[in-house]
């Protein structure tokens, strides 16, 4: 029996943070900034703005407690640990055989099989095998219920069968993800192409309406070209007058400055 004064350990959903977080104090952060400022000074003695990399920070003369403030290098290969479990950096999906799990469906054709002209490979039908696994799950669940009603102590074998079926179904869905991503990209590009065509059609329609309106004005005796040239000349004249007014204003301010 535990002692009355001993605190009871409470289970948590997530692992506690590493103890190095205790070193992230305002004082330590200020010390690190001062060291970085001193190290970034140039020949003129002025500190220069610099983006420090973790390798450059480790090269500085830091105390052990300040060394915890330096971010680690980003792993590029191998494995990393998350809540005590090793995660691989490789994006390739490992096969069930590599994980020591029985595979209940045939392996999809590889690139080597597709390139072999003497052995043409059929496309892998994910939906067909997913349907077969789903039916097997229903059958094994009924058998599992029957085992529990007759001999409950022999449930372990059926639990393993159900577990293996679920793992195979999940792995088969993961194999289908590249195809799903490709189809989603195709749908997205088709939607963008459709919007672009609609915009082009609207622009063509507007161009036709404007051209018809101009033709109508010409038919009524309005010189559209001369009107456009006069508008352009008026705009240029306004720009010239505005520029001249700005120069005159600047000259007046210069004269006032000399008087002061």
UniProtKB/Swiss-Prot annotation:
Gene Ontology cellular component annotations, sorted alphabetically: core mediator complex; mediator complex
Keyword Nucleus found: yes
Stored Pfam families: Med7 (PF05983)
GO biological process, one term: regulation of transcription by RNA polymerase II
InterPro entries linked: Med7/Med21-like, Mediatior_Med7, Mediatior_Med7_sf
GO molecular function terms noted in the UniProt entry: transcription coregulator activity
Places the protein is found: Nucleus
Entry keyword annotation includes Transcription: yes
Region feature (Disordered): 1-21
Keywords tagged on the record: Activator, Nucleus, Transcription, Transcription regulation
Subunit field text: Component of the Mediator complex.
Function recorded in the entry: Component of the Mediator complex, a coactivator involved in the regulated transcription of nearly all RNA polymerase II-dependent genes. Mediator functions as a bridge to convey information from gene-specific regulatory proteins to the basal RNA polymerase II transcription machinery. Mediator is recruited to promoters by direct interactions with regulatory proteins and serves as a scaffold for the assembly of a functional preinitiation complex with RNA polymerase II and the general transcription factors.
Family of the protein in this entry: Belongs to the Mediator complex subunit 7 family.
The name this protein goes by in its record: Mediator of RNA polymerase II transcription subunit 7
Taxonomic source organism: Aspergillus clavatus (strain ATCC 1007 / CBS 513.65 / DSM 816 / NCTC 3887 / NRRL 1 / QM 1276 / 107)
């Amino acid at each position: 029996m535990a002692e009355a004064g001993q605190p009871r350990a409470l289970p948590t959903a997530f692992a506690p943070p590493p103890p190095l977080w205790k070193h992230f104090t305002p004082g330590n952060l200020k010390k690190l900034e001062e060291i970085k400022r001193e190290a970034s000074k140039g020949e003129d003695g002025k500190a220069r703005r610099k983006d420090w990399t973790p390798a450059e920070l480790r090269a500085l003369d830091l105390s052990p407690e300040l060394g915890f403030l330096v971010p680690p290098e980003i792993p590029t290969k191998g494995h990393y640990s998350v809540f005590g479990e090793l995660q691989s950096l490789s994006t390739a999906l490992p096969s069930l055989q590599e994980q020591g799990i029985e595979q209940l469906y045939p392996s999809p054709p590889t690139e080597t099989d597709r390139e072999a002209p003497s052995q043409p490979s059929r496309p892998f039908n994910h939906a067909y095998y997913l349907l077969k696994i789903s039916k097997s799950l229903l059958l094994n669940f009924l058998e599992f219920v029957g085992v529990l009603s007759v001999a409950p102590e022999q449930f372990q074998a059926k639990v393993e069968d159900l577990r293996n079926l679920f793992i195979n179904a999940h792995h088969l869905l993961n194999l289908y993800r590249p195809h799903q991503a490709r189809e989603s990209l195709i749908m997205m590009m088709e939607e963008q192409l459709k919007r672009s065509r609609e915009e082009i059609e609207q622009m063509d329609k507007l161009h036709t309406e404007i051209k018809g309106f101009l033709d109508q004005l010409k038919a009524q005796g309005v010189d559209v070209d001369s009107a456009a040239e006069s508008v352009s000349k008026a705009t240029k004249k306004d720009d010239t007058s505005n520029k001249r007014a700005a120069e005159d204003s600047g000259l007046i301010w210069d004269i006032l400055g000399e008087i002061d």
